[in-house]
């Protein structure tokens, strides 16, 4: 793992979280309304980026890559999928951090990059 990986993770998780928050708000009032193609384009772009991190056991859905732009998903569909991606991103992060005297750090060669406490911890 490199510092670029850590930076990419932070950027990617931030984007997925922001989109999830926005679509969750829409879904509360209009869960069954299809998302528009403009928003779906951005969502799919971020999903493609996230898929480069989440491989193997970390991938939320084995056969899912992005939403089909011809069959527009509903707001609630997008919220469901993004919630799974956020959970898998946290699992990936937990597998790539370690603790040292109550502080948590990314497993990066030659550097100590501090991170927040994990929501779950998996020894690797």
Question: Predicted regions: what is each one?
Answer:
Residues 2-102:
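Charged interaction/catalytic cores of defense and host-pathogen modules
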Residues 104-124:
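Short acidic DE-rich linear segments
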């Amino acid at each position: 793992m490199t510092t670029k990986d850590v930076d990419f993770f932070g950027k990617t998780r931030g984007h997925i979280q922001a989109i999830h928050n926005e679509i969750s708000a829409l879904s509360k009032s209009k869960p069954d309304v299809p998302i528009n193609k403009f928003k779906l384009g951005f969502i799919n772009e971020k999903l493609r980026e996230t898929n480069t991190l989440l491989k193997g056991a970390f991938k939320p859905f084995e056969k899912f890559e992005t939403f089909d732009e011809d069959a527009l998903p509903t707001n609630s569909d997008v919220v469901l999928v993004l919630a799974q991606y956020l959970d898998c991103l946290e699992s990936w992060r937990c597998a790539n951090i370690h603790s040292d005297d109550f502080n948590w750090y990314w497993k990066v060669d030659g550097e100590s990059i501090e991170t927040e406490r994990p929501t779950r911890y998996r020894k690797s």
